[in-house]
Amino acid sequence: SSSRPEVASIEPLGQDGLRCSQRALVQARSSQPTRLTAIISAEDTLTGQVLRCDAIVDLIHDIQVVSTTRELYLEDAPLELKIHALDSEGNTFSTLAGLVFDWTVVKDPEANGFSDSDDALRILKFLESTYIPPSYILEMEKVAKQGDTILVSGVRTGSSKLKARLQESIYKDVHPAEVRLFILENILLNPVYDIYLLVGTSVQYRVQKLSQGKIT
């Protein structure tokens, strides 16, 4: 149950017609531009033990793009990017499910020697890949919307900047999140294994490039 259903409602996720469930969906209901808290509680019908937690509903103050790397290699698997949102106190929101974002690839004015291009990077749909995203992302893609998680793939070498903006009008003053990505050639050294040399001996290395699944 929720102590303040007008702030955060709770819906059991179990068999139809049953009030008891081990899982539940908590949804933010408040539309007020202020920080509000509701107490979510669950009771074990056998032992009477009560579990509780606070559900804090607040406005987003800042967004950031989170990535495992800033470098992509041509011919590599797509890179998954995700948005983290923070409140005014720096706390991270638990979920951004359902929020619509506008992701765009823009030119990078600070390429620092890299070829700057807005066509070096391509945004992919999860529906076009073998990746399995959260179910709400797939539902948003079906209606041509973008959520807090996307895939990107390198098209050609260079540097590109990716920008993400919240579409909700209430967040028009929240600065877009940006991330700079570098797309590099997939270069290999042959031989690829460790070499142990005697003093005075040498070994010849060859540089090879992976292109369209073939080494050239």
Task: Give the predicted meaning of each segment.
Residues S1-T216:
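Extracytoplasmic soluble-region selector
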